[in-house]
UniProtKB/Swiss-Prot annotation:
Family recorded in the similarity comment: Belongs to the class I-like SAM-binding methyltransferase superfamily. RNA M5U methyltransferase family. TrmA subfamily.
Record key words, sorted: Methyltransferase, S-adenosyl-L-methionine, Transferase, tRNA processing
EC code(s) of this entry: 2.1.1.-, 2.1.1.35
GO biological process: one example: tRNA methylation
Protein known as: tRNA/tmRNA (uracil-C(5))-methyltransferase
The species this protein was found in: Aliivibrio fischeri (strain ATCC 700601 / ES114) (Vibrio fischeri)
Amino acid sequence: MTQSVMNPENYQVQLDEKAEALSAMFSEFNVPELEVFSSPAENYRMRAEFRVWHEGDEMYYVMFNQETKEKYRVDYFLPASRLINDLMPLLTEAVKESKTLRYKMFQVDFLSTLSGEILVSMLYHRQLDDAWKEEAKALKQRLNDEGFNLNIIGRARKMKIVLDQEFVIEKLKVNDDILTYKQVENSFTQPNGIVAQKMLEWAVDCTQNSQGDLLELYCGNGNFSLALAKNFDRVLATELAKPSVDSAQYNIAANNIDNVQIIRMSAEDFTDAMEGKREFRRLKDQNIDLKSYNCNTIFVDPPRSGMDEGTCKMVQGYERIMYISCNPETLKENLEILSQTHNITRFALFDQFPYTHHMEAGVFLERK
């Protein structure tokens, strides 16, 4: 994605093209009419990464053209949130004044929120010392005095200095509810906050009037688990990445939700546990009796590689399947199996990444 293709005046055209392409791609499955969820045309991305270029006394952000690999200067980044764009020039001006902060800094990562919090990670090709820490504390105080709610992380080879926390607290509006989410630096979060809210509302709408329990695979920080909890008696969710599991546990407590249980294990291991092929100590340690759950609905949000055949077969055992996909190609492959036993009753496009070819899709399937 280059600056030249990001024109808000062309936003609707590129969205219509995506919708047409996605509908055509899945036409063989007799899908219902596509529900299209748009993004803001600018300032939609809650995180951004920039290389830092030093040129004499000058210092500025750069990105690289993916095709030509040539660098280009970035003073304003149209996709990034207003919070990131407001902070970008103030940060560089402040860092330029400090030899300690400036020396061998090569990258800055921003993680912002709709709630107003922002986290800045400053990356260096040198080890950081107490002098850096004191200068960074002063920088943080200076920027917060200007109205930001900001924390700073300094990173170098095999070291990390956190001032004063390595996460932000996001608040997402889902219909009439406000849900609180802890989002940790360097762990996965939905990049487009507005579209993330629309995805949650769509998932809640699809599962209204559900009976029994929900099983969720690949739950991340509990993004969907928390929003869907009110539609089910209980939610049992799996996630392998420890930082995401820790965030999910925090989020469950922060939202006072008492019917969500998170297990740290892979989808493949969970499939073995459900089928009784193996026993897992972590299930016993958490006093989780899989047989006590009455899961009629399963929610899957797999990585780009999709689900393996064994997981697809396991998923087919549920009456209703909700599948969020960041890769339509692997979604299509998985639907070739799932559509043998289930009909697609809802079909959605979420424009998480405007001005790119990336398409986030959602399907809801019910047993034939």
